[in-house]
């Protein structure tokens, strides 16, 4: 492990040289994984993506190429926020990997306005693609730069705003997302009003009535704040109780931008990327999220981490990244045997616009329905195919007969195994 850690930078630089070219996209995101022990100096309490409140955790970031192939990883203390990791990635792309022109893609919580201004804007050749948060979208509507009423279907439109003079803004509208958010808001507001009514009742009971302006406010925040709907209510809290009323104007204002999101891009000219390409580039962050799911769940399982020294923890995460690098390439090669959609470009071309979700290609739908490949052979998940390949073993045989030397013998591959080995470009001497 120490041997591997000492060579991490050299290995990552080699991967970058192979897969990151001048002007390419570099996808970056951060996740966390929790700790059971308490002696690792990196393990701190922070925002848990695993929903493990109160547990110590570490954070680690993953830098990938535009297809989601891992290039580099970095471990951070568990209390380090997403934006505070951006500077090191920008430095890595420019200095360690030697890229003179690159586009860093990160989500709205990662590439905040402060990080763009302080860490990216002054770096020549380093462009960025991200998205605006909800508050910023509202501000654009209020200043008149964005007009939601002009959209009635899936749509993409580039706008300009004096608030972002050196950036390109692309408004996207997704009616399906609009409907989903509206339904979710109705559901959350119903729960919010139910909880508020319960607390209000507690302040009015005859015995042990809940009293105290601060106590009532704290309980409201504790029991109701998690639904994030208090912004739509006007609360009047007194020492002996409180009243609440729905703010319909606030609800209407939020509903007006349901289904809208805005992509922001800096230092990217229109002749380099069209509006739709900016949208598709941002959506490629889902490839990093897919990598995190693989690293943290069924296939690789990054935890539990049985290390406490920083160097060993960093080596452990790096080893997991390298394992995912191998798995990524295996899945690419074995795609004809899996349920993988091999015609994603065809499916993308069938969309009305880039804001519309990508449906499965006709061939992928056929795969899912018939569960066979184009030659009628049964398809597999990656996990079941790996179980099948585990049946191929190499035995070292020592005969009990004097004079006969030790020899090795491999399992003769079955048809499915043979097909997989051929796709992977591997030879078997099984007999």
Language model feature labels by segment:
Residues 1-431:
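Anion-binding and metal-coordination hotspots
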């Amino acid at each position: 492990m120490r041997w591997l850690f000492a060579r991490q930078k050299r290995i990552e630089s080699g991967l970058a040289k192979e897969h990151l070219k001048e002007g390419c996209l570099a996808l970056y995101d951060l996740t966390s994984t929790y700790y059971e022990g308490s002696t690792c100096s990196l393990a701190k309490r922070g925002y848990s993506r695993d929903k493990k409140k109160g547990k110590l955790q570490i954070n680690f970031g993953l830098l990938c190429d535009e297809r989601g192939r891992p290039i580099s990883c970095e471990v951070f203390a568990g209390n380090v926020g997403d934006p505070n990791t951006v500077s090191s990635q920008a430095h890595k792309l420019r200095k360690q990997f030697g890229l003179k022109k690159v586009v860093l893609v990160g989500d709205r919580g990662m590439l905040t306005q402060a990080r763009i201004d302080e860490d990216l804007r002054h770096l020549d050749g380093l462009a960025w693609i991200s998205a605006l948060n909800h508050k910023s979208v509202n501000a654009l509507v209020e200043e008149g730069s964005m007009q939601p009423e002009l959209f009635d279907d899936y749509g993409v439109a580039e706008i300009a705003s004096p608030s972002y003079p050196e950036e390109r803004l692309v408004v996207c509208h997704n009616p399906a997302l609009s409907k989903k958010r509206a339904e979710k808001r109705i559901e959350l507001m119903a729960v919010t009003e139910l909880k508020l009514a319960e607390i209000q009742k507690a302040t009015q009971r005859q015995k042990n009535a809940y009293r105290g302006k601060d106590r009532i406010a704290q309980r409201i925040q504790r029991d109701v704040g998690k639904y994030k709907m208090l912004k739509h209510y006007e609360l009047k809290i007194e020492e002996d109780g409180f009243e609440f009323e729905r703010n319909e104007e606030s609800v209407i204002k939020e509903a007006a931008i349901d289904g809208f999101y805005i992509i922001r891009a800096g230092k990217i000219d229109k002749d380099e990327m069209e509006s739709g390409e900016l949208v598709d580039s941002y959506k490629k962050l889902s490839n990093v999220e897919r990598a995190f799911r693989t690293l943290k769940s069924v296939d690789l399982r990054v935890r539990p981490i049985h290390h406490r020294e920083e160097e060993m923890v960093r080596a452990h995460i790096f080893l997991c990244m390298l394992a995912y690098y191998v798995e990524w390439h295996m899945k690419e090669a074995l795609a004809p045997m899996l349920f993988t959609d091999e015609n994603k470009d065809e499916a993308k071309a069938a969309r009305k616009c880039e804001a519309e979700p990508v449906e499965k290609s006709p061939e992928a739908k056929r795969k899912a329905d018939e569960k066979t490949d184009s030659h009628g052979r049964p398809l597999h998940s990656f996990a079941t195919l790996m179980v099948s390949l585990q049946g191929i073993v190499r035995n070292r045989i020592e005969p009990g007969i004097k004079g006969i030397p030790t020899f090795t013998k491999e399992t003769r591959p079955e048809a499915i195994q043979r097909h997989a080995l051929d796709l992977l470009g591997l030879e078997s001497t099984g007999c």
